[in-house]
């Protein structure tokens, strides 16, 4: 079923089914080491929509607002950061990234649950996270923010299992901690440890070291 345009009337999404975030843990993965040598120590970045919507994230908002993308698991956060499913992930690509587990503060309002079947009545389908129409998904994000939502809970585009869940948090654009819910305590995650690699393998992503060519496709 195709994704429809979001409702135009203000307040149309006020009563959309919520998903509690307060007291849960989310994972954020970001590019810590940039190609030019710059190191981004902070995991927080709220991206505003660009002139080319396909250059940004599916739920980016128009400036001065922005969106930060997290997930419920490490594997989900890696796929969100990569924006692609790599069956053979170069180790250097993962090593260039940082990861933290964030404790969501008790003051964080619930997210609009995009996975709830009730959304179908408004034309909302899984294409809002699995599809490729960035302008349309960004319009849905703007409609949810218009109607008072501070976050979205949904699937992850490049998750081949269909089981991973992401959370997109809205705030002012730029590099800063979320401002509307108090401190977000962080714990560092080692993306190259065995536990992480097993979790990635479970969703079809296998790390490839330097010089290790990916397997040839089966004829």
Name every feature range the model reports, one short phrase each.
Residues 1-56, 84-219:
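Active-site and NAD+-binding cores of ADP-ribose-processing enzymes
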């Amino acid at each position: 079923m195709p994704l429809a345009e979001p409702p135009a009337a203000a307040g149309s999404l006020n009563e959309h089914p919520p998903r509690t975030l307060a007291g849960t843990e989310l994972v954020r993965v970001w590019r810590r080491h940039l190609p030019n040598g710059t190191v981004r120590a902070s995991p927080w970045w709220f991206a505003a929509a660009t002139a080319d919507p396909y250059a940004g994230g599916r739920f980016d908002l128009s400036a001065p607002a922005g969106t930060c993308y997290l997930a419920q698991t490490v594997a989900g956060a890696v796929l969100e950061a990569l924006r692609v499913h790599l069956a053979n992930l170069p180790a250097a690509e993962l090593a260039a990234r940082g990861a933290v587990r964030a404790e969501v503060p008790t003051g964080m309002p619930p997210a609009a649950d995009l996975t709830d079947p009730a959304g179908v009545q408004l034309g909302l389908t899984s294409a809002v996270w699995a599809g490729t129409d960035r302008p349309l998904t960004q319009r849905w994000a703007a409609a949810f923010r218009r109607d008072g939502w501070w976050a979205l809970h949904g699937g992850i585009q490049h998750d081949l299992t269909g089981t991973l869940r992401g959370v997109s948090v809205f705030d002012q654009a730029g590099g800063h901690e979320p401002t509307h819910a108090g401190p977000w305590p962080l714990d560092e995650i080692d993306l190259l440890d065995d536990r992480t690699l097993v979790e990635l393998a479970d969703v079809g992503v296998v790390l490839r070291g330097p010089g290790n060519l990916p397997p040839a496709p089966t004829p």
